[in-house]
Amino acid sequence: MFLLTLTVFAIAKTVTPASSLPDYYADLQGKSGKSLFDAVQKVTKTGYSSLGYSGLWTAFKTTDKKSNGKVWDMYSDCSWTFGADQCGTYSDECDCYNREHSIPKSWFGGSTSGPGCDIFHLVPTDGKVNGMRSNYAFGEVSSASYSYDGAKKGSAKSITIMGGNTIAGNDGTSISGSGTVFEPRDEYKGDFARGYMGGLLKWAG
């Protein structure tokens, strides 16, 4: 419950002026369990306006811009120029950047509408590294088959990780001690966890 409450607060802080927070939280008061989940989902969808999949390119120029004006890529340290370095095709790391669904879009049917274009969990990333991640769940890697700039893919450690078609409302698949996962760079694990939690709260069902 603490994690859910903390996550709700983090989501609210990103989209809601401080003076409006009491009103924003009003429907969450006194709720727990499924009723709290439903109320959070309603709140996160209220007033939401989709940018569209193509609109993400423009939005990234504001949401994911480094202090030097370059693209902020959480999968690599490559230096990208907005627009000029958009993918396109790629064969190696640092060829171009694309739009990464931190919650893989195949988990909700492959659509680029609805959750498929929600910038809360989409970020610009290296096209090659994104391709290597594929639609594997995030997790801790025990033995890497691929790594670049601290991001890696490989066998999961002995923990249970939820994957599968979660957003569509299914239970998903459980990986415990085996299977392939993708581990983001350490400094961005919190960012991706926040994107996961926010995306799942908003679109599950």
Give the ranges of each region predicted by the language model.
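Domain-level detector of nuclease and nuclease-like folds
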Residues: 88-205
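Classical eukaryotic N-terminal signal peptides for Sec-dependent ER targeting/secretion
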Residues: 1-6
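N-terminal module-boundary/linker segments of secreted carbohydrate-active enzymes
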Residues: 9-81
